[in-house]
Amino acid sequence: MGDSNFDDVLVLIPARMASTRLPGKPLADICGLPMIVQVAMRAKEAEIGRVVVAVDDPQVFDTVAAAGFEVVMTSKDHQSGSDRIFEALKKIDPDGKAKFIVNVQGDLPTIEPETVRAALRPLENEAVDIGTLTIEIDNEEDKTAPHIVKVIGSPISDNRLRGLYFTRATAPYGKGPLYHHIGLYAYRRAALERFVSLGPSTLERRESLEQLRALEAGMRIDAEIVDTVPLGVDTPADLEKARRILSARQN
């Protein structure tokens, strides 16, 4: 952000050991480093603020610390990544120095640093509570796939939408682009505090989409349009793909 300095921004990376499809995911080796360390490296390369990893397992804690990154232990019982990063925030920044919190998922080892930076840009508008990312869908299958979350948004510039709704359905109806939501968030501190204080909302439960809690509470979410979707590692096949991507970058 143009008028923020390094100390204003805190990048938090939640990491959970419990993964049904890929057990021990944070410690999976990618080009000689654990995945969670690769994610922390990408976040550091974004050069937007202090990077802290929020973990729920002593082995992951020790691994991250050994790699030279700041790490904080959090409860195993959190229902969402937002709850985990809020616990971490209270522990590592109790005085409230950080004004903006960027939540980078711990399974995005190939994310481009520029993509991390892009999530902050919507917060340049004082009216925006939460910034996030989106990309135009160019694959017909993705337009109807429930696992591809769509942003229904009103264009406010060539590269930004004001989020009106998020859905797993194919929407909006009619001719025009559809947008895939990328679940990386930048919060104003007060917005994160309010968000976690709210209980799950009606539409959040129905769509299984946490961000709807914010919209139902009247909070504003704007989405920056980016060029690439970061690879989320959820399966062994994803892990192999991530290894190929990072290996190619290193060579």
UniProtKB/Swiss-Prot annotation:
Q: InterPro entries of this UniProt entry?
A: Cytidylyl_trans (IPR003329), KdsB (IPR004528), Nucleotide-diphossugar_trans (IPR029044)
Q: EC number(s) in its UniProt entry?
A: 2.7.7.38
Q: Does the keyword Transferase apply?
A: yes
Spell out the subcellular localization from the entry.
Answer: Cytoplasm
User: What molecular functions are annotated in GO for this chain?
Assistant: 3-deoxy-manno-octulosonate cytidylyltransferase activity
Q: Name one GO biological process term.
A: CMP-keto-3-deoxy-D-manno-octulosonic acid biosynthetic process
Report the pathway entry: Nucleotide-sugar biosynthesis; CMP-3-deoxy-D-manno-octulosonate biosynthesis; CMP-3-deoxy-D-manno-octulosonate from 3-deoxy-D-manno-octulosonate and CTP: step 1/1; Bacterial outer membrane biogenesis; lipopolysaccharide biosynthesis
Q: Name one GO cellular component term.
A: cytosol
Keyword Heme assigned: no
UniProt KW keywords: Cytoplasm, Lipopolysaccharide biosynthesis, Nucleotidyltransferase, Transferase
Q: Name one Pfam family in it.
A: CTP_transf_3
Q: Catalyses which reaction?
A: 3-deoxy-alpha-D-manno-oct-2-ulosonate + CTP = CMP-3-deoxy-beta-D-manno-octulosonate + diphosphate
Concerning NCBIfam families, the annotation shows: kdsB, PRK05450.1-1, PRK05450.1-5
Q: Which family does it belong to?
A: Belongs to the KdsB family.
| Biological function | Activates KDO (a required 8-carbon sugar) for incorporation into bacterial lipopolysaccharide in Gram-negative bacteria.
What is this protein's name?
A: 3-deoxy-manno-octulosonate cytidylyltransferase
